Amino acid sequence: MKKAVVLLSGGLDSTTTLAIARGNGFACYALSVDYGQRHAAELAAATRIGQLLQVCEHQFLKLDLTVLASSALTDPSVTVPIHGTNRGIPATYVPARNTIMLSLALAWAEVLGSQDIFIGVTAVDYSGYPDCRPDYIDAFEKMANLATKAGREGNLLKVHAPLINLPKHDIIRRGLELGIDYSMTVSCYQADASGWACGQCDACHIRRAGFAAANIPDPTYYQDKR
Amino acid sequence: MKKAVVLLSGGLDSTTTLAIARGNGFACYALSVDYGQRHAAELAAATRIGQLLQVCEHQFLKLDLTVLASSALTDPSVTVPIHGTNRGIPATYVPARNTIMLSLALAWAEVLGSQDIFIGVTAVDYSGYPDCRPDYIDAFEKMANLATKAGREGNLLKVHAPLINLPKHDIIRRGLELGIDYSMTVSCYQADASGWACGQCDACHIRRAGFAAANIPDPTYYQDKR
């Protein structure tokens, strides 16, 4: 079995990505990065998902970006924006987040002798994020193949972004086909300690709209449905 | 004054790079990454150098790569190779190290509104490292400009690698012109707690040979000269 490093946040997209990697026959090594998020609920969800989907190994890397960054996701003094109030690049954007996470995945892939990295970015719902677009993923892959022993020796690394062109409702349908229980995942930017979602932030809005568009009951634990 | 993020390990190359950035008129923000190195001497040197060269701000980021990697620099069970015993890519290679460090510099540059990152890689002395070559630096820069808000908006980021084509003796001459006291820097892979260099590892060998080739007395504190 070929090994793959899968970036796993515990949200809907990365969980579906892990299920896809597994469904494609890869031995999956999950990597979760705690870059100073405000909610432990996300990492708790990642732990659950790693166990449920039986990854070969699950590593958690702590990297406190709060000393560098001051975005809504890492700085408690900044309010998470309510959906619809921001334009362009969201205020919840963490600088260079995907570049940092892919770099860490690259390091582990090299150690494992893996040539495959999976990341659950999607260009459709999060079009405001520059590092979720196909040209970015291609550029990272090119750089990575010049950065490593393996790439230089012709064992080319592939960055898989299987959701990149899928709208949320198609991601949800794909995940349900693969047997995912989405009530176990947490997408919310400000979930409470038990993993209940706020129902108000951009991530909650996109998730709710996705289940509605897929015409599938939304199993998410929302605080306003408690 | 334009701001620059400068990656600073406290070794000869990164210290010279910082002096060059400063000499070019940049307001310098030093970033040191503790990726699980075995010696605290390197970080102590970085602290000293940051103070001596009067950086605007100096951030230390802790990132324990030892959970992922098992190279000589991070795994205490692996012996640091004595110079001349290894071929091709050195055993002291840390997977994706420069990619990770440049990614963190990219994050800080974006937060600071800086379009300039300095890194002290050199393709001459460390030709075994894939991520020290010009084509790698170019590829990182291309990727970075697709990864960030600033790059997408046309405010292009530049990755400066001013030493990349210089042999060690030219780096040393350049640094002395800029007033660097190289006795304050630590290059050794296994310096002791006080910063005394082993004199035996690849880094020590290259450093010693550099001073010899420059025909300049080597001010390094070597354990075998104690």
From Swiss-Prot, chains A, B:
Query: Which EC main class describes this enzyme?
Result: ligase
Q: Mind listing the GO molecular function terms for this protein? A: ATP binding; ligase activity, forming carbon-nitrogen bonds; zinc ion binding
Which coenzyme or cofactor does it need? Zn(2+)
Q: Which reaction does it catalyse?
A: 7-carboxy-7-deazaguanine + NH4(+) + ATP = 7-cyano-7-deazaguanine + ADP + phosphate + H2O + H(+)
Residue positions binding ATP: 8-18
**Record-linked InterPro entries:** QueC, Rossmann-like_a/b/a_fold
Query: Under which pathway is this protein filed?
Result: Purine metabolism; 7-cyano-7-deazaguanine biosynthesis
A Pfam family matched in the record: QueC
**UniProt cofactor note:** Binds 1 zinc ion per subunit.
UniProt entry keywords in alphabetical sequence: ATP-binding, Ligase, Metal-binding, Nucleotide-binding, Queuosine biosynthesis, Zinc
> Which residues participate in Zn(2+) binding?
188, 198, 201, 204
Q: Which GO terms describe its biological process?
A: queuosine biosynthetic process
The EC number(s) this enzyme carries: 6.3.4.20
Q: What does this protein do?
A: Catalyzes the ATP-dependent conversion of 7-carboxy-7-deazaguanine (CDG) to 7-cyano-7-deazaguanine (preQ(0)).
Q: Which family does it belong to?
A: Belongs to the QueC family.
- What name goes with this protein? 7-cyano-7-deazaguanine synthase
- What lineage does UniProt assign to this protein's organism? Bacteria, Pseudomonadati, Pseudomonadota, Betaproteobacteria, Nitrosomonadales
State the encoding gene: queC
